[in-house]
């Protein structure tokens, strides 16, 4: 089986016919099942075979695929009872919205006899709003609590008022968390009720604090950094923490909205290049205020600039400014979150950034393509050379030349390119490192796909083997 290294790639080939895919599926190879489940489309015969496959792992891959048709995923509910849990959990890809299941599937899942299935369904990020809104009046408190957490913004004032006065304390707390920023009384109640909860710090940071409560929290010395981040914490009390021994507390004080640049500079704060900081809430809440964003983008304070960088409303002049910021995280956040991030910023971070997130920048719509062949075809860095095939003006001759590059990543990029001559695609199937990429090429003749399977010893008779 000298070419078995290339066989997996056929599972991702958009031109592979059902017969080829069914032969692959019969191998009971989990990686092949994964690649099949993530195809943009599946022939009906292959979809049916995966739905009814005796191996639970194959069905699970289908249930967890963000690319699989929601109707197809929902039909797993007609199979073994154990599949309901993976259907309920569903796909949860990073920063991607997954199309929801059909309503009938949610009805079955939310009325399932197993509590774990109901729980996973309620907490699945893909459950649509219209399914969750009616739960605000559900007889079972956990359902009302979920409605508070997930769709508060979609509830009417009357429904919200009812939830704020709900007989169940967990429901009341979930509702109160949404109004505490403007309600001192509910903030005080939450501080008492959640004193030993992980949500205590959230209340300290976001709740509306009366003077007496603020002074008590300061005196207790608990959660001082979240307390200092709360804009409702009186400025005169916050100033007492400016010289605190804990650097996290000093940093929180230095990033408060009422401070001038001079007042920030007077505090001994530090933000390291690897420090992970959440977006300052007061900046995010003011993201439609151009002047606030401009003040943050031009601040000497790193945290303010990082917070401005994630705001899509950041004005164009500030985008240009932060694209050249000396803090790597500022540039990366801008590249990740701003719809008008400069193409050259995306390219520079992709080639020179060390954070794992830079690899995802290449899929951004504004990632450059034109001119990359002339710039990088002969670059010493293989990551740069691989970009040359993104250039729409790259010639078939150049793509073929890159398909013979000593670097595996460059050869793989060329192997997937539609301009690569079919003759060379077939040759690359024998490449132990780039053969799998070549097998994904849509111009690969079906006869070559079949021949590859034959050489690899993949049985021609399709059968499910448990």
Where do the PLM segments sit?
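Alpha-helical scaffold segments
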Residues: 1-466
